[in-house]
């Protein structure tokens, strides 16, 4: 499903995309089992409780992982929620809704809505009965969501996109470092928030770095994401 909707090569989708979502759910369960939800501190009683209704807006590049990261903690905390997956990659959200139904999540606790960000996402951010918005996506959309949520003093949690450079120091093994960087940026077809799309190298090692980067890039298998040997599939 994830490979079909956003182009991740099937080998990567199976080993990383599906794995990451499962791991986050397992980690949430473990944290909930270890957490002390109510305790005394001196004469004060500390009680942790769900914040209320949550709007969850997820991106297309890690569809199931991002859904798991947001839905699992909300369920554990006892919140109700509305999930809007990216309109570009809606299949994982639909599948997750079926899983919740089959697992016996009570009606009204988990709700799924599809639609465009500027329309549905905007309404989810501004609605007066929503207590919290959790958003992962672009900086442009994130700033709009924060502004929309401000008048009703909603809590807003955001991870807004940006990519980081490789910083290769003079003492590094240039060939190994450059090869690792190029392979990392191609993972998930280059469509990850942490894809290192820039590389900073000492000026006197630039020619060597370019040579290695070219060799590694040319060896990467580009093709149909349904083929297990494919490393670089189609881009959204």
Sequence positions of predicted segments:
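ALDH superfamily catalytic-core signature
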Residues: 132, 140-236
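Long amphipathic alpha-helix in the N-terminal Rossmann-like dinucleotide-binding domain
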Residues: 7-35
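Rossmann-like NAD(P) dinucleotide-binding subdomain of oxidoreductase/dehydrogenase enzymes
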Residues: 37-176, 207
């Amino acid at each position: 499903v994830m490979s079909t909707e956003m182009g991740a090569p099937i080998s990567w989708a199976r080993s990383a995309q599906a794995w990451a979502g499962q791991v986050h759910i397992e980690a949430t369960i473990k944290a909930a089992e270890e957490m002390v939800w109510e305790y005394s501190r001196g004469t004060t009683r500390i009680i942790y409780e769900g914040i209320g209704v949550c709007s969850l807006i997820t991106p297309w590049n890690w569809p199931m992982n991002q859904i798991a990261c947001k839905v699992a903690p909300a369920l554990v905390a006892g919140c109700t929620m509305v999930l809007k997956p990216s309109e570009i990659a809606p299949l994982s959200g639909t599948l997750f809704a079926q899983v919740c139904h089959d697992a016996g999540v009570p009606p009204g606790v988990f709700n799924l809505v599809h639609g465009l960000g500027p329309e549905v996402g905007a309404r989810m951010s501004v609605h007066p009965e929503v207590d919290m918005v959790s958003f992962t996506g672009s900086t442009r959309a994130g700033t709009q969501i924060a502004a929309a949520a401000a008048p009703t003093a909603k809590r807003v949690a955001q991870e807004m996109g940006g990519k980081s450079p490789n910083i290769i120091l003079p003492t590094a093994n240039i060939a190994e470092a450059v090869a690792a960087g190029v392979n990392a940026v191609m993972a998930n077809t280059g469509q990850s928030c942490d894809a290192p799309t820039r590389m900073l190298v000492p000026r006197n090692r630039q020619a060597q770095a370019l040579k290695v980067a070219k060799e590694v890039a040319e060896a990467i298998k580009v093709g149909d994401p349904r083929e297990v040997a494919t490393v670089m599939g189609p881009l959204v």
